[in-house]
Amino acid sequence: MSKTPFLIAAAFALCATTLFADHAEARERSRAVQRTAQGGSVAVERSNARFDSQRQRTWQADGQGNANAARSGSLSGAHGGSAGYDRSAYRNADGSAGRQGSAYANGPNGGNASTSGGLSRDADGNVTGARSTTATGANGNRYTGSTTVSDGTLVHTRSCTNAAGDAIACPRGN
């Protein structure tokens, strides 16, 4: 027995249910692209019953060895969660370069986290950077950490507190 009629019927049924989906399940998507010899940009938006999201990206170069790029995005969930990020990087003709970035997340039940930092290299090759991170659980426990690097030395500090603000031991990851 041939499976072709069954597959055609299944495809038709799938298409028919997609056409008649109620508005709450409708999906939307848009995309815009621009390009030139020196750079460009892309922007994308999506929306459906589960989430809404946006993201953007840009880049630019001058033909002399200097270039930069950036990207960002965000997401909002139907149940209250949200997240986002923002990053950029550059490179100069003299050999210096760097990058910066930040990100956040907010849970629907009260937890949240955020991080930000950057790293740079000067024309002589010296590298410096820092990053800080905070996270708070729905129960109020909080982690705060920072990392720095300079002259080849890496330093990390961290602290944890409970909802009352009392110091507690920071949990170790697996």
Language model regions located:
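Low-complexity repeat regions of mature extracellularly deployed or surface/particle-associated proteins
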Residues: 24-174
